[in-house]
């Protein structure tokens, strides 16, 4: 019993000492951008990974009448001098309606030429990251980053014509690691540019990705340590997922380009 009390006392002292050395972040950033882009690609969804339960590399976004999409992106970060932690979210949700120009099988449901199909898609990414600033001079900063990324997918469709289908859905999540970084250059006190590039480390079902953007920020308001900045820029996004089912795989490949980005940033 005495040994347990001694160990508990030592543990309590260690925790107290660690907590005493902790400090609150010295700065925070909240950034919201809304993205407008043109998407291409396909979503191949079998049933149970079995042969002949999906058309290969179909349906394409083009035949689903999905071309131009828009979606939100959020960044919330905290920094202790050069070290930072953050959460980033990209919620790419879009839909389309079309009349099929040829037969289609998807999720083991047979649709015929002339059938009407409406579909909803979700490609959402939730990224939890660490960063470290290397300030090369008063204007230029390089920031390598590493993230644990959770991919949230949903594919839902309905159809009328040769058969009636109501809200058939396939959804799942997948986790992976992303690496990359950003380069920031301050031209003046009020205007700067940020180049941001991230990619998934290929693992399991996530085969490849590239998320790149070049954005400018212009200061709208500054008081003490508080800033409000306007954000505008351009980007590119690609993502390839193919699971490990033996016969037929859930297989999604998409590119969004160019992406036009508009937003606002709060620093305090």
Question: Predicted regions: what is each one?
Answer:
Residues 26-32, 74, 83-87, 128, ...:
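Transmembrane beta-strands of outer-membrane beta-barrel proteins
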Residues 138, 200-211:
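Solvent-exposed loop/turn segments connecting transmembrane beta-strands
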Residues 39-70, 91-125, 151-173, 201-205, ...:
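Extracellular/periplasm-exposed beta-strand and loop segments of Gram-negative cell-envelope proteins
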Residues 19-35, 41, 224-227:
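Outer-membrane beta-barrel biogenesis signature
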């Amino acid at each position: 019993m005495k040994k347990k009390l001694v160990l508990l006392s030592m543990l309590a002292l260690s925790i107290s000492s660690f907590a005493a050395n902790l400090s609150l972040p010295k700065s925070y950033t909240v950034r919201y951008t809304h993205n407008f882009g043109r998407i291409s690609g396909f979503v191949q969804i079998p049933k149970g990974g079995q042969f002949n339960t999906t058309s290969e590399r179909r349906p394409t976004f083009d035949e689903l009448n999905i071309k131009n999409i828009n979606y939100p992106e959020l960044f919330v970060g905290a920094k202790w001098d050069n070290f930072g932690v953050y959460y980033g979210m990209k919620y790419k949700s879009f839909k389309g309606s079309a009349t099929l120009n040829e037969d289609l099988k998807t999720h083991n449901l047979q649709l015929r030429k002339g059938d009407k199909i409406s579909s909803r898609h979700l490609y959402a990414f939730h990224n939890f990251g660490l960063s470290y600033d290397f300030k090369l001079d008063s204007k230029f900063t390089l920031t390598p980053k590493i993230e644990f990324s959770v991919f949230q997918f949903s594919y839902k469709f309905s159809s009328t014509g040769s058969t009636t289908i109501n809200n058939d859905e396939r959804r799942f999540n997948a986790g992976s690691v992303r690496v990359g970084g950003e380069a920031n250059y301050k031209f003046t006190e009020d205007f700067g540019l940020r180049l941001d590039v991230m990619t998934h480390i290929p693992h399991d079902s996530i085969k490849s990705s590239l998320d790149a953007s070049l954005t400018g920020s212009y200061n709208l308001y500054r008081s003490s340590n508080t800033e409000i900045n306007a954000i505008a820029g351009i980007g590119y996004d690609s993502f390839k997922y193919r699971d490990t089912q033996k016969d037929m795989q859930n297989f999604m490949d998409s590119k969004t380009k160019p992406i036009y980005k508009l937003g606002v940033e709060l620093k305090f």
